[in-house]
């Protein structure tokens, strides 16, 4: 179903484009509308075409009595426009085409093209290439590439110690139970003024 809708929309766009091109060709052939560069309605183009055809018929009928200068002044210079208009007839194989006016191609914004002088300077200069050295280098035997070995001596750099390189005897937490308290010797006391006073102990060496 989406393919059918897409084809129908494409046919409709083609039809509208063909009609617009036909009206553009008709406008270019009308002296009264040729100077208008902006868009003109289709109804105005048709009315101007009818008036122009009537004027042509009258001039053709009275061309023997009217001088050529008056005809040129009335109709203006008839210049064929290089715009192509394709008219489809009853037979699908018969198509009448007129010369097409070259239209400027609409390029996307991301595409850029180099001008001719710059593009010409970018062409390679083959006159400076030494083909003899290239041919001799192509015949030379290939030189085996030496891969670096993991056992080859590596370059030495100044060694910096880390925390893992220092000894561990600076701080070693002890896991043994604390020692029992030392036994205290019995202390002697003196009675002074009916009070019990501890006697100082003396250590003998």
Swiss-Prot record:
Gene Ontology MF terms in the entry: bHLH transcription factor binding; DNA-binding transcription factor activity, RNA polymerase II-specific; protein dimerization activity; RNA polymerase II cis-regulatory region sequence-specific DNA binding; RNA polymerase II transcription regulatory region sequence-specific DNA binding
Region (Basic motif): 3-16
Cited Pfam families: HLH
Segments forming domain bHLH: 3-56
Region (Helix-loop-helix motif): 17-56
CC annotations in GO: nucleus; RNA polymerase II transcription regulator complex
Localization of this protein: Nucleus
Keyword Nucleus: yes
BP GO annotations: positive regulation of transcription by RNA polymerase II; regulation of transcription by RNA polymerase II; response to food
Tissue-wise expression: Expressed in the ADL sensory neurons.
UniProt keywords, alphabetically: DNA-binding, Nucleus, Transcription, Transcription regulation
Free-text disruption phenotype from the record: RNAi-mediated knockdown in a rrf-3 RNAi hypersensitive mutant background leads to decreased expression of srh-234 in the cell body of ADL sensory neurons.
Entry-linked InterPro entries: bHLH_dom (IPR011598), E-box_TF_Regulators (IPR050283), HLH_DNA-bd_sf (IPR036638)
Role of this protein: Acts as a transcriptional regulator. May mediate transcriptional activation by binding to the E-box motif 5'-CANNTG-3'. Required for the correct morphology, terminal identity and function of the ADL sensory neurons by controlling the expression of the ADL-specific gene repertoire, including chemoreceptor encoding genes, ion channel encoding genes, neuropeptides and the neurotransmitter eat-4. Regulates the expression of the srh-234 chemoreceptor encoding gene in the ADL neurons under feeding conditions.
Protein name (record): Helix-loop-helix protein 4
């Amino acid at each position: 179903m989406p393919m059918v809708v897409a084809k129908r929309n494409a046919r409709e766009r083609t039809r509208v484009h063909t009609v617009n091109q036909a009206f553009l060709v008709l406008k270019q052939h009308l002296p009264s509308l040729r100077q208008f560069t902006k868009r003109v309605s289709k109804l105005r183009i048709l009315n101007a075409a009818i008036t122009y055809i009537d004027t042509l018929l009258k001039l053709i009928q009275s061309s023997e009595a009217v001088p050529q200068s008056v005809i040129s002044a009335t109709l203006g210079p008839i210049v064929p426009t290089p715009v192509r208009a394709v008219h489809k007839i009853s037979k699908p194989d018969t198509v009448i085409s007129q010369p097409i006016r070259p239209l400027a191609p609409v390029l996307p914004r991301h595409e850029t093209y180099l001008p001719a002088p710059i593009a010409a300077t970018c062409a390679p200069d083959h006159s400076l290439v030494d083909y003899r050295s290239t041919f001799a280098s192509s015949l030379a035997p290939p030189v085996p590439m030496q891969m670096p070995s993991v056992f080859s001596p590596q370059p030495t750099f100044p060694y910096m110690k880390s925390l893992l390189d220092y000894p561990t005897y600076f701080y070693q937490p002890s896991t043994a139970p604390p020692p029992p308290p030392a036994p205290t010797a019995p202390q002697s006391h003196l009675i002074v003024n009916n009070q019990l006073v501890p006697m100082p102990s003396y250590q003998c060496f």
